[in-house]
Design a protein with these regions (language model features):
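Conserved donor-binding/catalytic core segment of Leloir-type glycosyltransferases
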Residues: 15, 58-111, 117-120
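A short, active-site helix/loop in glycosyltransferases that binds the activated sugar's phosphate group
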Residues: 4-37, 44-77
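A charged, aromatic-enriched C-terminal amphipathic alpha-helix characteristic of glycosyltransferases
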Residues: 238-268
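Short alpha-helical donor nucleotide-sugar binding micro-motif in glycosyltransferases
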Residues: 161-162, 168-172, 260
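Glycosyltransferase donor-sugar binding loop
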Residues: 104-108, 129-144, 161
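Aromatic "clamp/platform" in nucleotide-sugar-dependent glycosyltransferases that forms part
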Residues: 180
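Nucleotide-activated donor-binding/catalytic signature segment of Leloir-type glycosyltransferases, i.e.
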Residues: 143-162
């Protein structure tokens, strides 16, 4: 806080990763517009990895066997299915018409995976939908307990940390991003780069910079009803894969680097 005030007072150039973050600094710390503050959005890199080692023979892990195996995992803290098994299950589910949601990020109160679980509890609406939560548990197992309590082992998968996300995005229909607060929302961009649309809250810092109607539906408020309605719309919508990829490419690591270099040159001129 003190640094931000001093930087504005002395016209010291700083950069932030989203327009929403800039607006919050101006409103909460400075009380006015900051001419020294430049927005340079985050970037990421798409890796075109080979998935050969994840492909297994048809029928080696049936749907029933995976669900039984996953139920056993749920009842033990910090235990997850093998990535290769989850890959096979998602591949099978996709082939059989399931709609698949991803929610990427460590499982915390702020990331708000709990709300996604509460929404998937409505199995009448989301009977044909599978949600995968990717990330380490940093919530003392609260989300895990809720999945067990609601008997959602057929609808919500705790996937754990996934260092091969690039080969999994092809299974995803919609990327959920329901954080309470978030500076930029890198998982949104990662999804875009693979042609995956996003459902997120209208009031997040990330939304202002990452909203494109071709790639995102915004939830107007934070109620379960609003998220459910928006998610249903997203799952029924005919998204254009290539258009979303083009939007994702606007946030590549190369473009981010170029913006920083140009900003630095401008500051030093």
């Amino acid at each position: 806080r003190d640094f931000l005030i001093k930087a504005e007072k002395n016209n010291i150039p700083i950069s932030v990763i989203s327009s929403g973050m800039k607006a919050r600094i101006e409103e909460n710390y400075l009380g006015k517009k900051a001419n020294n503050n430049t927005v340079i959005t985050n970037g990421t890199k798409k890796n075109d990895e080979n998935d050969t080692k994840f492909i297994r023979e048809e029928g080696t892990l049936t749907k029933e066997k995976f669900q039984e195996y996953y139920s056993d995992c749920l009842n033990q803290n910090d235990l997850y299915p093998k990535l290769s098994d989850t890959y096979a299950y998602l591949q099978h589910s996709k082939k059989n018409g399931k709609k698949i949601l991803f929610f990427v990020g460590n499982i915390t109160k702020n990331k708000n995976q709990m709300q996604a679980v509460e929404i998937l509890k409505n199995t009448k609406v989301f009977e044909n939908t599978l949600l995968v939560l990717w990330g380490r548990e940093v919530d003392n197992g609260e989300v895990r307990k809720k999945i067990v309590e609601y008997q959602l082992h057929k609808n919500v998968i705790l996937g754990g940390f996934n260092d091969r996300m690039d080969i999994f995005w092809k299974f995803c229909d919609v990327n959920l991003f329901l954080s309470l607060n978030d500076g930029f929302g890198l998982p949104i961009v990662e999804g875009y780069m693979h042609g995956v649309p996003c459902v997120t809250f209208e009031d997040l810092d990330a939304t202002q910079d990452l909203y494109y109607p071709e790639a995102m539906l915004k939830v107007k408020d934070r109620s379960n009803e609003s998220v459910t309605d928006t998610l249903k719309t997203a799952l029924d919508k005919n998204w254009k894969y290539e258009e979303i990829i083009e939007i994702g490419n606007m946030f590549s690591i190369d473009i981010m680097s170029e913006k920083y270099v140009n900003w630095y040159k401008e500051v030093m001129a």
